[in-house]
Amino acid sequence: MPNTLNTAAEQARDALANLAAGKLDFKIDSLMRYAPNSMLSKEAAVLVLFGVLDDEPSASADFQGCPDYVGENLDVLLLVRAGTLRSHAGQPAFPGGKIDPEDYELARQQGVPVGRIAALREAVEETGLDPAGVEILGELPTLPLAVSDFRVTPVLGWWASPTRVGVVDTNESALIARVPVRDLLNPANRHTAYVKRGRITHKTPAFE
């Protein structure tokens, strides 16, 4: 009898690799309309790390609106930023942060994009994960984060050998969690929040 968990994991990993390689449609026009990258001065990278839950499946296991490769055990690593931070306090986020000068030199030495170096370094610092178990699949297009003056590169990763993670520094993070992807895709858990900054009100995705 085939191992359906391994098969689903392989399908998910292959789909993510195709996304990173530009073989799947990925529309970001709506995310680019607020500020072009040329107007922003700082660079950052985040690690979008997918894996397979070790213990319990998604609470949305019965939700039928997912692609076949999004099994009930597929998860993504997220954190909640500390409430005392100057920017994006208390917000959920991917592990990551500003690209440091030494990241550029290390990227040059290894012959890889600098976003990979920075995203993995920050993820280790924030969550304590073992980088040896992470397979970097590639990068998605750099996105503007005008509110904090950053150009952010999402780095796609596959957690081939998951390790224990948790809050490393309470001044940086309040929570580290592996969140089932099906829960994020389930419309019952998805909402729209309205954030007002000055005279402008922005719509943003929100999750229950």
Where are these regions (language model features)?
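N-terminal leader/linker segments that precede catalytic domains of diphosphate-processing enzymes
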Residues: 1-94, 98-165, 182, 187-208
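Short, conserved loop/helix-junction motifs that constitute active-site signature segments
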Residues: 170-171
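Conserved cytochrome P450 K-helix/beta-meander segment immediately N-terminal to the heme-binding cysteine loop
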Residues: 176-178
